């Protein structure tokens, strides 16, 4: 084959030569076809060959379909069979050479990029959203290839060195990846494990490289990645690449384990709520870390800032494609209140400059309902309105319906019940049209709950109004139970309990609220747990069952305050009323009688924090 021909013509000649050789009976096996392809195709040009082969197949297929002469048709059929053999062996060639192709492509992109774009090219090569991201072995090969060009450009040598050191550091961490989990069986996640008990401290002990070690120690003492960046403005390209490799593969290693059977075994042994909860926590934690690094380097090292933003968006894109992406809640299972506030603030800013995509709509959905849980209702509405528009334009009906439901819930919190009913009705219609059963269950609950709250506000006393609303709630619960959706079930039980509480049917309210609390515990939703406990306290108070009111109210107050929800003040107010009615001594006695039960849920530190929290409420009022 003449190399003076354009590449397309070279490959057309190669294909025709194989077909003609086959027709002459000179091809003895498919292996011979494969060897001819191996010899004739240049690495890195597979797309060109694939286009030429596709065109040739189409032409021959047309000849077979249109030819009327039997001899010519038979020859065309044999040619088509030969072309399909080429196609099969080409697919084999692709599979066996995709690693070489990927490395060659990455090498070419890095070495031809401008100085400011070299990191971008490297990050694109390891982006998990790509069809063939480089794995550790391929990265090692890439580093060796780049090292050969180090004399031509110092950056290539630094990138190669960073990759090599990063892989070595990750391999040291990998064998000790989960030690911290088994040492801290009752406290998982990344918010709320300070000092030597944190995963960061655990990894700092085993990594044998300065920059990753300093980074992990910074986070272990509850400083942020932003503070690390501000102290590392002169970080070398090699060190930056090393840290990138370590953090990228650390995050992926954690996610792989949390999504695996290993996590299932851990759940069975220690914590039934672990798997998805920890995966969600990991995705968001590392997204926040990269956002903070982007922020920290934006003034002095723009290329590092841009690279960090690129990684953050890659992580979020991967996260939104997971089946457990929490469209309807659950984030409060993974973070303490202060950590969550930081996460929301850091994820908000970079998303503003990102194009409107399905991924962005889903992240905005998460930000929206999280802001609602924190009591930031205007911000919640803003996020959900943005997400609604983007999801609609992206054709993501599931996300669109979720945001209609969330808008309904947020308007209920603002006591704008007509808007809440409007959005829940729209969600119900769309969910039934599209067959979104989870969306339908949530819409039924939101509609029933909104109507109960509106009837209460307008002081409607007709029982049929409440019966209709409660019927919606019961339909939603039945559907959620059928789906096995714990998050939606918890919301259904809770909404039914509140509806019966509002209508003064206290024993029935308690039954549903207790179920709501238990289901929220299994789902791992701290916000719903705290909220249900607060309403249980109110229901028991109305029945003059002060012991249970104090028990539930104290737990609810503590859990809500821990996630920074302003709703903690509601049970705090009730507890102060009870204390005033029964006296301080009796109140303290009721707390003491339930001490062991409360410690089992919130620990000794949580129990000891209840009296100071009540004092805090009184001081703030």
Language model features: what each stretch is:
Residues 364-367, 371, 383, 400-411, ...:
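TPR/Sel1-like alpha-solenoid repeat signature
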Residues 331-347, 376-385, 420-425, 463-475, ...:
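Helix-turn-helix repeat elements of alpha-solenoid scaffolds
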């Amino acid at each position: 084959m003449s190399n003076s021909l354009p590449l397309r013509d070279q490959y057309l000649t190669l294909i025709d030569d194989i077909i003609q050789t086959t027709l002459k009976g000179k091809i003895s096996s498919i292996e011979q076809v494969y060897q001819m392809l191996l010899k004739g195709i240049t690495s890195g040009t597979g797309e060109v060959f694939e286009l030429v082969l596709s065109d040739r197949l189409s032409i021959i297929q047309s000849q077979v379909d249109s030819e009327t002469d039997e001899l010519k048709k038979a020859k065309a059929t044999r040619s088509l069979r030969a072309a399909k053999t080429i196609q099969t062996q080409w697919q084999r060639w692709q599979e066996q050479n995709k690693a070489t192709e990927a490395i060659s492509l990455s090498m070419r992109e890095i070495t031809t990029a401008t100085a400011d774009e070299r990191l971008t090219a490297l990050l694109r090569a390891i982006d998990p959203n790509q069809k063939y991201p480089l794995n550790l072995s391929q990265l090692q090969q890439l580093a060796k290839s780049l090292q050969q060009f180090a004399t031509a450009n110092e950056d290539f040598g630094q990138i190669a060195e960073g990759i090599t050191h990063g892989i070595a550091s990750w391999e040291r961490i990998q064998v000790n990846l989960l030690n911290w989990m088994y040492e801290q069986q009752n406290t998982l996640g990344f918010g709320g494990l300070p000092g030597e008990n944190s995963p960061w401290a655990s990894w700092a002990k085993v990594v044998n490289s300065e920059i990753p070690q300093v980074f992990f120690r910074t986070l272990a003492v509850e400083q942020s990645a932003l503070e690390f960046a501000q102290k590392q403005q002169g970080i070398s390209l090699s060190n930056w690449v090393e840290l990138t490799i370590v953090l990228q593969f650390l995050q992926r290693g954690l996610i792989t384990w949390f999504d695996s059977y290993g996590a299932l075994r851990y759940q069975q042994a220690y914590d039934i709520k672990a798997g998805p909860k920890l995966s969600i926590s990991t995705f968001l934690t590392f997204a926040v870390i990269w956002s903070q690094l982007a922020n920290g380097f934006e003034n002095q090292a723009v290329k590092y800032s841009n690279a960090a933003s690129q990684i953050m968006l890659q992580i979020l894109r991967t996260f939104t494609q997971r089946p457990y992406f929490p469209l309807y809640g659950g984030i409060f299972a993974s973070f303490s209140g202060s950590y969550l506030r930081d996460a929301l603030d850091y994820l908000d800013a970079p998303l503003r400059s990102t194009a409107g995509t399905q991924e962005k709509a889903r992240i905005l959905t998460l930000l929206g309902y999280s802001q609602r849980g924190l009591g930031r209702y205007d911000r919640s509405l803003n996020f959900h309105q943005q997400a609604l528009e983007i999801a609609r334009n992206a054709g993501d009906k599931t996300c669109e319906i979720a945001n209609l439901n969330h808008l309904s819930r947020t308007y209920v919190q603002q006591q704008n019940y007509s808007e809440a009913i409007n959005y829940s009705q729209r969600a119900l219609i769309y969910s039934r049209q599209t067959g979104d059963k989870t969306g339908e269950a949530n819409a039924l609950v939101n509609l029933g709950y909104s109507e109960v709250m509106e009837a209460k506000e307008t002081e409607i006393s007709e029982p049929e109004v409440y019966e209709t609303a409660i019927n919606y709630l019961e339909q939603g619960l039945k559907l959620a139970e059928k789906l096995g959706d714990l998050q939606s079930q918890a919301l259904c039980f809770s909404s039914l309990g509140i509806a019966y509480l509002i209508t003064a049917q206290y024993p029935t309210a308690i039954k549903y609220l207790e179920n709501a609390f238990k289901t929220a515990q299994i789902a791992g939703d701290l916000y719903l747990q705290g909220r249900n406990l607060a309403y249980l306290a109110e229901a028991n108070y109305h029945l003059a069952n002060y012991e249970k009111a104090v028990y539930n109210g104290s737990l609810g107050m503590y859990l809500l305050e821990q996630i920074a929800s302003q709703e903690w003040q509601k049970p705090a107010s009730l507890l102060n009323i009870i204390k005033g009615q029964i006296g301080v001594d009796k109140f303290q006695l009721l707390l003491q009688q339930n001490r062991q039960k409360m410690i089992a849920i919130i620990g000794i530190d949580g129990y000891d924090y209840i009296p100071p929290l009540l004092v805090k409420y009184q001081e703030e009022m």
